[in-house]
Regions:
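Beta-propeller domains with acidic blade repeats across secreted/periplasmic ectodomains
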Residues: 1-199
Length: 199
């Protein structure tokens, strides 16, 4: 289909498409222009699905070429965000984690949980989802309405936030400390953005 841009001078170029990627649920760019993408193979996986058992965190060069799998050990992966010091941040339904390639082979081999969600709800896309960085280097992420079930979110330092039936936006440090809720009253807030002024 023909795509029309709304702003003069903006150009859109197709860089990658199916079958190189499947069900993209998050995308980010790093300082080298590489494209990081969460390809979700586990969201309502159909019977007889022949794709990978888990979701894939894919990396493409800036031109959309040289597809490689960085990580493939998460399920219901709803977002990917490039972070500081080589960490790649992921939002799964029940946790926010970060993954790093510590030996330089291009594959994530070190994983750390930053925030874990304790709840009986398991619907794949109304748990943890969107992520962004605030101007002070804090990680901002969101939680959906969680099917109206009780939940408790816990950071790496033991800080806890609990609730029921409403989505929200949370902030913690890049290593999962100081967890706190900064907004509430959302359905499933996937596309988080933080302006330069922190709003």
């Amino acid at each position: 289909p023909q795509i029309e841009t709304l702003k003069p001078g903006v150009k859109m170029t197709l860089l990658a498409e199916h079958p190189a990627l499947v069900t993209p649920t998050g995308i980010d760019l790093d300082d080298k222009g590489r494209i990081w993408l969460a390809a979700c193979h586990t969201h309502f996986r159909p019977e007889g699905y022949e794709g990978p058992q888990h979701d894939e965190i894919l990396v493409f060069d800036a031109d959309g070429k040289n597809r490689r799998v960085f990580y493939n050990k998460t399920d219901a992966t709803m977002h990917v965000e490039v972070g500081p010091d080589g960490w790649i941040y992921l939002a799964e339904r029940d946790r926010v984690l970060r993954v790093k390639d510590s030996d330089g082979d291009g594959t994530g081999d070190t994983e750390e949980n930053l925030a874990t969600l304790d709840t009986v709800a398991d619907y794949p896309h109304n748990g943890l989802s969107g992520m962004a960085w605030d101007p002070n280097g804090g990680l901002v992420f969101s939680l959906g309405e969680n099917f109206g079930k009780d939940w408790t979110l816990t950071g790496t330092d033991g800080a806890k936030v609990s609730g029921r039936g409403e989505g929200g936006v949370f902030r913690c440090t890049a290593d999962g400390k100081g967890l706190r809720r900064i907004a509430r009253g959302f359905w499933n807030p996937f596309g988080l953005l933080v302006r330069a002024d922190g709003e």
